[in-house]
């Protein structure tokens, strides 16, 4: 293997800048104003301000970029700095750059439903570029309850008259098909689809984006990526921690709305879709919509719901169950774990189960796509062979590996499980790539919508899950208890086995570069 040359962060950012500035859509010379609606909130201080700082620090933003915070709270830039800077991870050497960054920040206080407040915000932004061409990006870091008032006032009062306007909308995009359609219809009445960026940060993950290249740039996968060779597909999202005092928000939505209906379903689309005509945003999203249209509504017989309980042998938070969280309503039946089986009813995938599973307070932090292949026909090894699997590990330790059988060293033909290792982190050692939020915000600056959710995608996703969600909301079935730190309810394993997944439990991936 050729020796890998480690790139410094400066070199990597230089390559990224070159890629960005060569693109037609990245208007480096223009003034850009990035407006954070809800600047006083948790999302803004923990994610958005740090992300904009990292992009500014690494020279990835257009040079003449201003950041404007807007919220109801009477704050100053110094207040915003005190709240958000602990999440910046800035080094002492970066202090001068940090001062430059905050010199480009300003803050405007105002109500979300008051037209006069937006006139004041617009006057403030106009003063920043004094009549020159300026583009405006509005990030709605707000609860959906105020979306309608905020978007209406932005459209009527705060749109740039000399450049483009783009609006970033955070999930949840509604609670069901009806509320999502209502929100989509409202926003679509104010903005064109090419101005709307519905952000699902999982679509910014490197390995999620890598799915398309793996599938369509490698000849070896094309002939086997179908129902004749693949027995089942498992899409997993596991967190090792519970709600930890933040259960009030989670209880309103639950694990299906929070993770399954968006993150996991988007990954399913990338696994199942046909090759798009090009990598243009709409070509890719057209193929994803075709997949969603082939999926029927989830059947309750193919769903397992769970809720974690305290581990009597655990320590700290692990001793607390979901209902022990003081912010969770007493007796709540909200699921913190869900497994569901979907079927893509088309020629390529007919009969192949797509198993979606996600949960909190589980045994590990992991997000992955696992394709389990069918048994080898004509077994000559006396049932010693396990099924091949292709695993795309999204987090942690980004990796792609194939579980396969090889001969065990010795005199006899004894097969054993091994892996063909394509560990991403080792191949690109020391390469610091933008994280999901950095990548997606750069996409908005560039006008690329490939990794954002289109209105028809959203509609189909809610169509699939809304009947199940309504049934759960109305009947409030008792979720199956599972112990904090476990693999989840055993009933989920039984469901997976019933639809065709074979869990051997004899193999664990080991990063060979850390041995």
Curated annotation (Swiss-Prot):
It catalyses: D-glucose 6-phosphate + NADP(+) = 6-phospho-D-glucono-1,5-lactone + NADPH + H(+). NADP(+) 1 binds at residues 38-45, 72, 147, 171. The modification Phosphotyrosine is found at residue 503. GO terms for cellular component: centriolar satellite; cytoplasmic side of plasma membrane; cytosol; intracellular membrane-bounded organelle. It comes from the Eukaryota. PROSITE patterns: G6P_DEHYDROGENASE. The active site is at residue 263. Keywords: Acetylation, Carbohydrate metabolism, Cytoplasm, Glucose metabolism, Hydroxylation, Membrane, NADP, Oxidoreductase, Phosphoprotein. The keyword Acetylation applies. The modification Phosphoserine is found at residue 8. Pfam families: G6PD_C (PF02781), G6PD_N (PF00479). Its EC number is 1.1.1.49. Its main location: cytoplasm. InterPro entries: G6P_DH, G6P_DH_AS, G6P_DH_C, G6P_DH_NAD-bd, NAD(P)-bd_dom_sf. The modification N6-acetyllysine is found at residues 89, 171, 403, 432, 497. PANTHER family: GLUCOSE-6-PHOSPHATE 1-DEHYDROGENASE (PTHR23429:SF0), GLUCOSE-6-PHOSPHATE 1-DEHYDROGENASE G6PD (PTHR23429). Belongs to the glucose-6-phosphate dehydrogenase family. NCBIfam families: zwf. Cytosolic glucose-6-phosphate dehydrogenase that catalyzes the first and rate-limiting step of the oxidative branch within the pentose phosphate pathway/shunt, an alternative route to glycolysis for the dissimilation of carbohydrates and a major source of reducing power and metabolic intermediates for fatty acid and nucleic acid biosynthetic processes. Homotetramer; dimer of dimers. Interacts with SIRT2; the interaction is enhanced by H(2)O(2) treatment. Forms a ternary complex with ALDOB and TP53; this interaction is direct. ALDOB stabilizes the complex inhibiting G6PD activity and keeping oxidative pentose phosphate metabolism in check. This is Glucose-6-phosphate 1-dehydrogenase.
